[in-house]
């Protein structure tokens, strides 16, 4: 049985973060689609988040979001409590031969801080949208590196306590991290190596230029839609299946990069998800390969029979 957070208003008593009931979530996502959060909570800091975790029954769903850059929130919204990490979780500090970053710190901002400190190895982060928390949750990677190659440890809020886990305990693999169910990443330490600031910045400029040339970075999109199958590139399979420019409602496959879905202005989450499923079906029919979603899809569907997990 799922219990509504509003059935127990005392859950939020004396918490310092902001509480909003029936909060629209579309403005919080890069796709600009999705329904409402039954209750949206922006914790002031880690203590605020842990207090909430201790108070909330397991019967109340709790969803953690950050920048929501690689996420589709379905049109029926999110039940229970949606926790959005922001201020209070975005501190970035230099720590010897590494960087410690809060979960809400933007990947690109962490890369920039490392560059200014003369620390190399995190340049790839400037080409990844979203936050450090999300990057860890999916072992994000690009341009020859990934989180698994630089993560030292991660601190998690779980059941109201903070636990520090070494990277070796997360079973990091391609776009996967074995995080404990119900946890929230709060901060992490990333390894670096000494480097020349000018060289690091030049490398980041090259990455940004390559990204701008190949991806629809100024569109309403959610990053790579599907994981690359072993030894193959998803975009090539999608293109070969005739899906470049394919549309469904207000959703469209990018003409610039076939592994990106776009909200052309009036898309719903159902449009995007249905288009993704059509791509999967066409690729399967074309070459026999099953594409798996990289974009995370959460929430309550809005009566769209073609949207399947």
UniProtKB/Swiss-Prot annotation:
SUPFAM superfamilies: FAD-binding/transporter-associated domain-like, Uridine diphospho-N-Acetylenolpyruvylglucosamine reductase, MurB, C-terminal domain
PROSITE patterns for this protein: FAD_PCMH
Top-level enzyme category: oxidoreductase
GO terms of molecular function: FAD binding; UDP-N-acetylmuramate dehydrogenase activity
An individual GO BP term: peptidoglycan biosynthetic process
UniProt keyword terms in alphabetical order: Cell cycle, Cell division, Cell shape, Cell wall biogenesis/degradation, Cytoplasm, FAD, Flavoprotein, NADP, Oxidoreductase, Peptidoglycan synthesis
Places the protein is found: Cytoplasm
Active site annotation, chain numbering: 175, 224, 294
Pathway: Cell wall biogenesis; peptidoglycan biosynthesis
Cofactor(s) of this protein: FAD
Short name of any one Pfam family annotated for the protein: FAD_binding_4
EC number: 1.3.1.98
GO cellular component: cytosol
UniProt domain FAD-binding PCMH-type: residue ranges: 33-195
InterPro entries linked: FAD-bd_PCMH (IPR016166), FAD-bd_PCMH-like_sf (IPR036318), FAD-bd_PCMH_sub1 (IPR016167), FAD-bd_PCMH_sub2 (IPR016169), MurB (IPR003170), MurB_C (IPR011601), MurB_C_sf (IPR036635), Oxid_FAD_bind_N (IPR006094)
Reaction equations catalysed: UDP-N-acetyl-alpha-D-muramate + NADP(+) = UDP-N-acetyl-3-O-(1-carboxyvinyl)-alpha-D-glucosamine + NADPH + H(+)
Family: Belongs to the MurB family.
Function, in words: Cell wall formation.
HAMAP family per record: MurB
NCBIfam families, alphabetized: murB, PRK13905.1
PANTHER family: UDP-N-ACETYLENOLPYRUVOYLGLUCOSAMINE REDUCTASE (PTHR21071:SF4)
Protein name in the entry: UDP-N-acetylenolpyruvoylglucosamine reductase
């Amino acid at each position: 049985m799922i219990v509504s957070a509003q059935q127990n208003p005392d859950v939020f008593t004396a918490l310092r973060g902001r509480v909003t009931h029936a909060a629209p979530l579309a403005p919080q996502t890069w796709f600009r689609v999705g329904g409402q959060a039954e209750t949206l909570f922006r914790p002031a800091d880690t203590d605020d988040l842990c207090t909430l975790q201790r108070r909330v029954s397991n019967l109340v769903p709790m969803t953690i979001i950050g920048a929501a850059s690689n996420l589709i929130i379905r049109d029926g919204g999110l039940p229970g409590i949606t926790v959005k990490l922001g201020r209070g979780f975005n501190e970035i500090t230099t720590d010897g031969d590494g960087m410690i970053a809060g979960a809400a710190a933007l990947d690109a901002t962490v890369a920039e801080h490392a560059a200014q400190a003369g620390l190399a190895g995190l340049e790839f982060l400037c080409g990844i949208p979203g936050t450090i928390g999300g990057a860890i949750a999916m072992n994000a990677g690009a341009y020859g590196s990934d989180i698994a190659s630089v993560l030292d440890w991660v601190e998690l809020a779980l059941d109201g306590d903070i636990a520090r886990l070494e990277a070796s305990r997360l079973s990091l693999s391609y776009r996967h991290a074995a995080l404990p169910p119900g946890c929230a990443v709060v901060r992490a330490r990333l390894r670096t190596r000494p480097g020349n600031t000018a060289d690091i910045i030049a490398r980041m400029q090259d990455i940004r230029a390559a990204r701008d040339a190949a991806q629809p970075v100024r569109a309403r999109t959610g990053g790579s839609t599907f994981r690359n199958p072993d030894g193959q590139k998803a975009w090539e399979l999608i293109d070969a299946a005739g899906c470049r420019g394919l549309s469904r409602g207000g959703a469209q496959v990018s003409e610039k990069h076939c592994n990106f879905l776009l909200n052309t202005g009036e898309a719903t989450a159902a449009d995007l998800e249905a288009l993704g499923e059509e791509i999967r079906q066409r690729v399967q029919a074309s070459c026999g390969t099953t594409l798996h979603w990289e974009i995370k899809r959460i929430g309550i569907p809005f009566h769209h029979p073609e949207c399947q997990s």
